[in-house]
Amino acid sequence: MTKKLLKAGAALLVKKKTESQWHEDDLRTIENYRPLDDDFMRELFRNDLPLAQLVLRIITGIEDLELTKEETQYDLKRLLGSRSICLDVFGTDSKGRKFDLEIQRADRGATPQRARYHSSAIDVEFLKAKEKFEELPVSYVIFITENDVRGENKLIYNFEWTDTANGTPLNDGAHIIFVNGAYNNAEDTSDLAKLVHDFRCKRAEDMKIKELADKTRYFKETPEGVSIMCKAIEEMRNEAEKLRTYQIALNLIAMGTLTDEAIAKATDLTLEEIAELKAQASAVTA
């Protein structure tokens, strides 16, 4: 009886809907998406180096910035034993400079400490063994925030290490930038103000930067683009379901009252997956 109840409970975690109901929900989600939503932002920038280059030029003020490589959801691979991070948009330019572009809607996700960790993680990732410290690449960690997390009503906040006595820059090559997504000044006609305005828009027709409007229109108003977005949303939904199932299995493992076979049956996971989860749980608690 216990096994049947567990399996029933796991199934009820996700409300069953028809395919057409899911599709209608997805269309509403797409309609309400803004570039300030990180799921949509990643699709906007995926495999679109020119758009990423344009946005980075506007934010950094580097007019001749030539992006040579751009990836979305970039995993830093050299943080073994440390907290892992996945960068929303990551790029490298012709001078070897590294750019991390992040969307942070929640204030708690846009702390100075988080920005510091991103900057440090990029340093670790791109300085190989035996290389000189002077070979560290120049890096830009950019947080576009939904709210004015710094509270000074500025459009952009630029941070570098400086001498606290006289303001002389350290020139270590690390830059941290917060872009205030809540900034709204009708008299500001700068490209950055236009960009921030567009990041809040749901409709392409309301946007001021053509390149961003065109890409938004593609994903929201063309059959091909909408299909891509629906597939991306479905993949995210499936991943969320899988993570919930893993969490149920981990809870059952922690209880210690069921066999691996019973847990696998209750969660529809394989015995191999249960064994891997147990190994991960043991590593965390060791």
What do these predicted regions represent?
Residues 2-31, 92, 99-104, 190-286:
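Short, charged alpha-helical interaction segments and adjacent helix-coil junctions
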Residues 119, 123, 146, 183, ...:
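Short amphipathic alpha-helical signal-transduction/dimerization elements
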Residues 1-175, 185-187, 286:
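Accessory alpha/beta interaction modules
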Residues 174-198:
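Compact structured core domains
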